[in-house]
């Protein structure tokens, strides 16, 4: 699998604190190894638009689509509680 980052994702990533960026980088490596890795807690977020959600940490999530052999990163944001 490969990774593609949308412009919207890059803007969100740039706004995230450095410790969140570092945690995200670790999580995306796990995603590349195994979509079902337990610490990602990846799940289908929006069935109609084929959007997935995965966990960065307790307070942050990232969103992506799977297009062929590519994970398209859409956003990384604080998790609304």
Describe these PLM feature segments.
Residues 22, 27, 43-44, 81:
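Context-gated lysine
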Residues 2-7, 11, 15-22, 53-81:
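Enriched for short, Lys/Arg-rich terminal
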Residues 29-54:
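A short, surface-exposed loop/turn module that caps and links secondary-structure elements
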Residues 25-30, 76:
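A short beta-strand-loop micro-motif that forms or neighbors metal/cofactor-
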